[in-house]
Amino acid sequence: YVEDDYRNIEGQYDAFVSIGMLEHVGRDNYPALSELIKRSLKPDGIALLHSIGRNRPMLMNAWIEKRIFPGAYPPSIGEFMELCEHSDFSVLDVENLRLHYAQTLSHWMDNFTANQDKVTEMYDEHFTRAWRLYLAGSIAAFRAGSLQLFQVVFTHGDNNQLPRSR
């Protein structure tokens, strides 16, 4: 088990799991990440990448880029697949969990609202308003289908020992 910056990972493992990191790597770093995953997986190793995504390639919203996630880039499913193609991974499963994530964000909004006074004391009113706007907008975007939550399972090599279904 390794919990570290992906660039520091050494050794080989049976599995590589990344939750909510790909959208923060930056598209220019996908080839390096792909090579690292390939190098880190044992033969027949399995990987799962889970990332916020979009319907098509586009620049990040300027407000979110500035206020919430500087440098983030949620990929389209095609860009996600390019990462897999770069290292000749065998894609086994692609799932879109966007409605699950909309519900998660809704719970986050409820918790944020319940603790809004504490958050404002820790930061300021501007921060609180920005995050409420971000959470509300994200809930709407996931529900409407303009944001996605992709989960992709793939192997290094032809691992035919895995279950044929979820």
Protein language model features and the residues they cover:
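A short glycine-rich, Lys/Arg-flanked "PGG" loop and its adjoining helix->strand segment in the class I
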Residues: 31-46
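Residues lining the SAM
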Residues: 18-23
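Substrate-binding/catalytic lobe of Class I Rossmann-like enzymes that use SAM or dcSAM, i.e.
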Residues: 52-164
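Serine-hydrolase catalytic core recognition
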Residues: 30-33, 49-51, 57-58
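A short His-aromatic
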Residues: 8, 24-25
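A short acidic, Gly/Pro-enriched loop at the edge of an enzyme's catalytic core
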Residues: 7-17
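Conserved SAM-binding strand-loop segment of SAM-dependent methyltransferases
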Residues: 1-6
